[in-house]
Amino acid sequence: MTEKRKKIEPVKADLSPTDLIEPEKKHKQLTWSPFMAVGFVLVLYILTQVVAGILISIYPAFQHWTNDQTTEWLNSSVGAQFGYMVLVEAATLGGLWWFLRRHKSNFRALGLTRRPKLLDPLLSAGGFGVYFVVYIILVMVMSWLVPSLNVNQEQDVGFSSATGLIALSMTFISLVILPPITEEILMRGFLFGSLRRKLPFLVAAVLTSAIFASGHLTGGAKGSPLLWIAFIDTFILSIVLCYLREKTGRLWAGIGLHMIKNGVAFVSLFLLHVH
């Protein structure tokens, strides 16, 4: 007797790996609720800055500096600002690691499941092009609709006294390396992934982007009004980052795009001195 061979249907070649995975299944390892994720991100954002501020203030306390001396050191010292940034990013990742461990999860569930591939830098560059074009168009439209919008308002990124190789290197790490990694893991990996588990892509992306952009509203000089131009900028950036996270299932392309964006700002502000 001869056995009947089962007919094997070939997989369609025009499908990408992520097309074979439903969005809900991409984020099935995230067992906590979207509401819990939003609350945790907001608390973590505030708490890490408080903890970093306390820790960085230990050095002036040992030096027996006055409040004015401490404030001057924190505002003008590149080393102090670098140390503060390192503490904030470390506390953020540490807090997120604690949360994931309590829920029997890990960073792989947030999109860190493989090494970057050659396609990722291309997606990053393409994403930057999309972000830049949309940003220019939207700013033109918003300037026409809202004439009072201050498109020239500057964001205070710190490190104003950075000169020389060592100081510029610390500034580069603080602005171009650390925030893209930490913010993508927290915002697009954790927050967007948590929201996407229950919500459609557009709703999850808009909510994530609104929360992310709100953190940049108060980034101006002390006493300056809210930075609505920075809100628009980072909101558009986040939408593109969420799209990359959705389509690739991972964070590498988004991290690359975020680094390109911050890298352009670094070159403009600290090397070309364009304000």
Stretches found by the model and what they are:
Residues 1-114, 118-119, 143-144, 263-275:
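N-terminal, membrane-interfacial amphipathic/helix-forming hydrophobic leader that caps
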Residues 22-23, 31, 70-74, 94-96, ...:
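Generic preference for well-ordered secondary structure
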Residues 36, 40, 115-131, 179, ...:
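Alpha-helical transmembrane segments of multi-pass membrane proteins
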Residues 41, 88, 127-128, 208:
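Hydrophobic alpha-helical transmembrane segments of polytopic
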Residues 46, 132-136, 140, 144-145, ...:
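Transmembrane helix-loop-helix hairpins at the membrane interface
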Residues 102-122, 190-208:
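Cytoplasmic juxtamembrane regions at transmembrane-helix boundaries
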